[in-house]
Amino acid sequence: MQNTKLYSLTLIALGAAIIAVLSPLAIPIGIVPVTLQTLAVGLVATVLKARETFFAILLYLLLGFIGIPVFTGGTSGIAVLFGPTGGFLLAFLVMGTLISWGLHQIKYKTIPAFIINIVGHLLMLVIGTLWLKFFTQVDWSLALKLGFTPFVFVEIIKAILVTIFGLALIRALSHTNKYFTN
């Protein structure tokens, strides 16, 4: 029992570290930059189980909240987490947990895994755009233009990459560790 808890905590810390290392890398386009954050969240969600995924993302958000520069562009703090783009960050909890839970339910079958990852990434965009719209009080057209439309294609590509690499990683790890078996 102790080893299982320790292993789970280790996976949570490792998941948060992966997200934290990749998140500061960004390509600025508009108010919401294209980042490796969603790629990292998707990868963690694809490889880890829902509980570990949720807590890895929560730990990552807490690190940024307390001032460690782990958000896009090396930013951090309450103003980022609860600012105009904070909805995208908070949506990672929903995105990651949904992806992880869904993949476990379908036993990591390839085609459904692509669909689940794409839906998770698009759901994150919807939640983030809703937050952006209500936070900034812009009209729907502008909110979609700033937070959704420019990122749909990129997020679908990220979801496809995450599925390919994540499933390959799970298959490789399942030979050495029963955590990664269905």
From Swiss-Prot:
Record's keyword terms, sorted: Cell membrane, Membrane, Transmembrane, Transmembrane helix, Transport
A single GO molecular function term of this UniProt record: biotin transmembrane transporter activity
Entry annotated with the keyword NADP: no
Membrane topology, as annotated: Multi-pass membrane protein
First-listed, main subcellular location of the protein, grouped into a coarse class: membrane
Transmembrane segments: 12-32, 54-74, 78-98, 111-131, 150-170
Subcellular location: Cell membrane
GO CC terms in record: plasma membrane
Coiled coil: none
Family: Belongs to the BioY family.
Subunit text: In E.coli forms a stable energy-coupling factor (ECF) transporter complex composed of 2 membrane-embedded substrate-binding protein (S component), 2 ATP-binding proteins (A and A' components) and 2 transmembrane proteins (T component), probably with a stoichiometry of 2:1:1:2. May be able to interact with more than 1 S component at a time.
Function, in words: Probably a biotin-binding protein that interacts with the energy-coupling factor (ECF) ABC-transporter complex. Unlike classic ABC transporters this ECF transporter provides the energy necessary to transport a number of different substrates. The substrates themselves are bound by transmembrane, not extracytoplasmic soluble proteins.
Name this polypeptide is given: Biotin transporter BioY2
